[in-house]
Structures are given as C-alpha cells and as structure tokens.
Swiss-Prot record:
A Pfam family reported for this protein in Swiss-Prot or TrEMBL: tRNA-synt_His
Protein name: Histidine--tRNA ligase
Keyword Ribosomal protein in annotation: no
EC number, UniProt record: 6.1.1.21
Alphabetical list of Gene3D superfamilies matching this protein: Anticodon-binding domain, Bira Bifunctional Protein, Domain 2
NCBIfam families according to UniProt: hisS (TIGR00442)
UniProt GO BP: histidyl-tRNA aminoacylation
Compartments reported by the entry: Cytoplasm
Quaternary structure, from the entry: Homodimer.
Length: 429
C-alpha cells in the first residue's frame, strides 16, 4: 500500500510554509495593536459543543462534521469552526468573572475540519484565524472589529475587497422575519432545490444564502429583514453604519446574506473579493449575544470573525501579491578538509548565537558544489574555511553579491561578526 496523505489535506512544505508563518505573524501583530491575546483550544470537542451552538440543522452538523465515539464511548467531534470552542473555554474557565477585564478580547489560529468536497482554497483540514470579543454590546465594538479585519486585509495586500453588511436583528425581530419568509416561500416550495425545501422547514433564513440558481430566483422578491427590525435593532444597525462611515469604511447592504451558523444576531458581515469572475469570501463574522448564556454562562455580548488561511493565500497568489518574506542566509561556511570540520561547527554555532542566520556544509563536497549551495540559500556572505585557515586563525569573508572581501580573524567572527557584516555593506537589526 502506498502511504500518502488523506484526501482533502495537504503537506505545507518550504518555501510555502514561510508564507504561512508570515500571515500568522502579521495577524498577531495587527491583533496586538487592538489589545487581543491568543487563546488555544483543543482540536476536538464534545459533540454537543458544536451541534448545539452551530445549529443542529446547519450543513456543518448534518453533513460535514468529523465525529466519532472514543474508547470511553464519549461522542467527540473535530472542531469545524473556532467560535464555539472559544465560547466553551470562556464559560468553563469563568472568564466572565468580575476580576477579568472587559471587554475580553481573544484571537486564535489553527486547523479546523469539515468533510466536504475538496476544491481550490477549501480542504477537509483547513486553517482558520479568528477573533472573539466578549462583554460589549456597544455597536462601536462591531465597528472596531470590522475595521480591524479591514486593516488586516488592506495591509497584507488583498485587493478589491468589498464589505457586505447585514443585520439579523434581535431574537424578536428575527422571529417576525422568519415567519414572513416562511409565508413568502411556502407557495414557492416546489420550485426550490431539495436542500432549500428541507431548510424551509428547519431554518428558512438559510434559503437566502443558497447558491442554487432556482433558489436565487425564488428569493429575488423575498421580504427584507430591514422591514422587520424593531426600534432596538434598527438603532443598533444605524449606529454601526454611521460609525463605519465615520471611519471611512465603505460597505454594501446585502439583505440576502445570513451566514451559515445559527448563533448570529444583529450585525453580520463578509469581506468579498472577485477572483476570475467568482466572488470569494475572504473573512466573515458578526455578533452573537446569546451564545455565552447558551453554554451556561451569564448573558454576555459577543462579536467576532474568522478567515481561512488557505483561501487568503490563494487570493494573494491570484492577485499577484508577493509577501515580503526574508529567506536569505546571512552567512554560509564552505568547509574544505576534515581538519576544518570541528572549527566550522564552532564557528557556525557562534554566528547563530550572535543572532545571524547561518549554515555550513556537512557533506564534504567539492568547493564548487558548496558555492552553489550558498547561491541557492541566497547567502549574503561566504566564508571558506580550510585547514590552512584553521592553522593561521585568519579567514576571508566575502560579500556574495558584490564579491568584496575582507580578511579577519576567526576570533573576531566568533565574537563580533556584526562589525564585519556592516563593513561588507549589510546592516544588522
């Protein structure tokens, strides 16, 4: 049997992995500016954590979950999204306690799992970066979080992004709209896709989100949620829109956008960009004020978003965006002769301990092959260390781009290479 990765997964290898590290590091830097701290939750949860919060009737739960019974007969699922595990952790660890600063701001990043048809930018094991903010029902929190997502997408280089905005109102507004939608769609039931006929019975708002042609035609003249907002819901949505305008964040009202998870209320949003004629959602989220209490905590407001790393990288690639990744070696040591082996090891270690990215030859190859390796590694400087250099204690350090050389002692390299590095035209951090 040929051993290979499971369908819908990938090996992320160098140099591709450097792009992942850059995106993750960039996200951490942006989130830190907004006072978010990292939280790490298990990749598997009790089945009920996901099914009850995401919604028993959602596609995630009915079709896409990886769930199983473990050896203790506990019903376990691999996490298909990030919000429910973070909320479970928030409640379990009593982060709602008075001594914990509010609002509480967390971010996460890591693998998620859904059993769906693998395609470009969508895998069965995929990676998500997300944020969750607890304890503020202020519409300014909605806007700050949306603005943070916009800030991240703009600075990382995504082009042509449009913010789609909607509201689901409070539970009362949503219930009134739900009934109006049922009344509108029931006479059209036979024209809907099989999935949407099922959704009409279980969660009619999801019909609005369908990508099927017949469903899109059916909802073209459907009632709008904006006509069913009560005073509180309308005031919240108006405030969100006004503050976005104050910050100069453009948006499009999209009343057919409902998001695929049942826990949202009030503001929901998606950042969408067009790639090769197709609209791709790069980041999405919204408000979920009832989820913490649903998990057994006190009534607590919540707001967050998630974005898929695979999709983000796909969009950057399609848009021709090159991430500023530093791959170059600072120093490469070419080693000539067995007598130089130990000194080369001491030297490369001393360079690394001074903060330089350094490598040496270990394969006893001809110098020409070692110089080629230095070029492949885009080494800034090159040291050739043979037995005669070890005996004399002197060595030549070459700028591998300009070919400029300086003669220095091995002791200087071991103790103060930054002086030589700068003399050859490079600058240390």
């Amino acid at each position: 049997m040929k051993l290979q990765k499971p369908k819908g997964t990938q090996d992320i290898l160098p140099p591709e992995s450097a792009k992942w590290q850059y995106v993750e590091g960039f996200a951490r830097e942006i989130f830190k500016r907004y006072n978010y701290a990292e939280v790490r939750t298990p990749i598997f949860e009790h089945y009920e954590v996901i099914s009850r919060s995401v919604g028993d009737t959602t596609d995630i739960v009915t079709k896409e979950m990886y769930d199983f019974y473990d050896k203790g007969d506990r019903h376990i699922t691999l996490r298909p999204e990030g919000t429910a595990p973070v909320v479970r952790s928030y409640v379990e660890n009593k982060l709602f306690a008075p001594e914990v600063q509010k609002p509480s701001k967390f971010y996460y990043m890591g693998p998620m799992f859904r059993y769906e048809r693998p395609q470009a930018g969508r895998l069965r094991q995929f990676h998500q970066i997300g944020v969750e903010c607890f304890g503020s029902s202020n519409p300014a929190t909605d806007v700050e979080t949306i603005a943070m997502a916009a800030h991240f997408l703009k600075e990382i280089g995504i082009q042509g992004v449009k913010l789609h905005l909607n509201t689901l109102g409070n539970p009362e507004s949503r219930a009134a709209y739900r009934q109006a939608l049922i009344d509108y769609l029931t006479p059209l039931k036979e024209t809907l896709s099989k999935d949407s006929q099922r959704r009409l019975e279980e969660n009619p708002l999801r019909v609005l989100d369908s990508k099927e042609k017949e469903d899109k035609e059916a909802v073209e003249n459907a009632p709008s949620i904006l006509d069913f907002l009560d005073e509180e819901s309308q005031a919240h949505f108006d405030a969100v829109r006004q503050m976005l305008e104050n910050l100069g964040v453009d948006y499009i009202i999209d009343t057919n956008m409902v998001r695929g998870l049942d826990y949202y209320n009030h503001t929901i949003f998606e950042f969408i960009t067009e790639i090769e004629g197709n609209d791709l959602t790069v980041c999405a989220g919204g408000r979920y004020d009832g989820l913490v209490s649903y998990f057994g905590g006190p009534e607590t407001a919540g707001f967050g978003f998630g974005l898929g790393v695979e999709r983000l990288l796909l969009i950057l690639e399609k848009q021709g965006v090159t991430l500023p990744i530093e791959n170059a070696l600072d120093v490469y040591i070419a080693v000539l002769g067995e007598g130089a082996n130990i000194k080369a090891l001491e030297l490369v270690q001393a360079l690394r301990q001074q903060g330089f990215k350094a490598e040496r030859d270990y394969l006893n190859r001809k110098l020409k092959a070692q110089f080629k390796s230095a070029d492949v590694f885009v080494a800034k400087t090159l040291i050739t260390l043979g037995e005669s250099e070890v005996e004399s204690g002197q060595v030549t350090v070459k700028n591998n781009q300009t070919r400029e050389e300086v003669q220095v002692s091995l002791e200087t390299i071991s103790q103060n290479f930054s002086e030589i590095f700068e003399k050859l035209g490079f600058y240390t951090q």
